[in-house]
């Protein structure tokens, strides 16, 4: 037997108001409020996705429309505090390209790509050698990027990770999709006063 659940016409008249409220609620999730909004399940989904992709570390970037940039709001690397202070402008670099096109991106020799903006690499003092970036949607819009990287290894450190492949990108895309559902559920639950979210 198929599961079938049709929209309830009684709620249709409230759809526009709910959509508007959802957009306003989504804009409240910023670098300053992310740690209060996010729960362990959300951050675990990201960490598991980065690990499954074979990344050295990963970052969730959320758009800051007022400043026209992407702000790092979550990172699971060794320099998490420094990373969460960083931003990337929306007018250059591959992460901004993914945000504007809505298309995922994967490259293993990224340091050779002239479109790669090395600003973050310089700020953390560790060159990126490979990157996956996928758009992150919630509240019906692309509002950020989920990215993960391989970093250049220092002499004498552990061997380089395997190259990113299509399975790596699927893992990061899956994590972003799960995170979308968690964000949307939490926002809608808070708006309608449902549950303990």
Q: What feature does the model see in each segment?
A:
Residues 1-40, 178, 182-197:
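Signal-transmission linkers at sensory-effector interfaces
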Residues 21-29, 37-56, 60, 94, ...:
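Amphipathic alpha-helical coiled-coil segments that mediate homodimerization
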Residues 47, 59-83, 151:
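GAF sensory/regulatory domain recognition
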Residues 80-81, 108-130, 155-161:
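Signal-transducing coupling segments at domain and membrane junctions
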Residues 81-105:
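Acidic/proline- and glycine-rich, intrinsically disordered low-complexity segments
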Residues 95, 136-156:
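Sensory-domain boundary capping and coupling elements
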Residues 129-137:
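A short, aliphatic-rich beta-strand micro-motif
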Residues 157-184, 190, 194:
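Amphipathic alpha-helical "output/dimerization" segments
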């Amino acid at each position: 037997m198929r599961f079938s659940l049709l929209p309830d016409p009684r709620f249709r008249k409230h759809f526009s108001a709910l959509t508007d409220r959802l957009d306003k609620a989504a804009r409240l999730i910023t670098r300053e409020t992310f740690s209060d909004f996010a729960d362990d399940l959300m951050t675990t989904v990201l960490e598991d996705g980065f690990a499954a992709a074979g990344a050295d570390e990963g970052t969730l970037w959320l758009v800051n429309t007022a400043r026209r940039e992407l702000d790092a709001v979550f990172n699971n690397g060794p320099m998490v505090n420094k990373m969460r202070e960083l931003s990337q402008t929306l007018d250059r670099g591959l992460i901004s390209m993914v945000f504007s096109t809505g298309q995922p991106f994967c490259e293993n020799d990224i340091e050779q790509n002239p479109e790669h903006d090395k600003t973050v690499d310089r700020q953390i003092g560790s060159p990126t050698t490979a990157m996956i970036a996928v758009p992150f949607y919630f509240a019906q819009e692309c509002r950020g990027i989920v990215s993960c990287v391989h970093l250049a290894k220092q002499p004498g450190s552990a061997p380089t990770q395997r190259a990113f492949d299509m399975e790596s990108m699927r893992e990061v895309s899956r994590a972003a999709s799960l995170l979308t559902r968690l964000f949307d559920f939490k926002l809608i639950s808070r708006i309608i006063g449902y549950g303990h979210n």
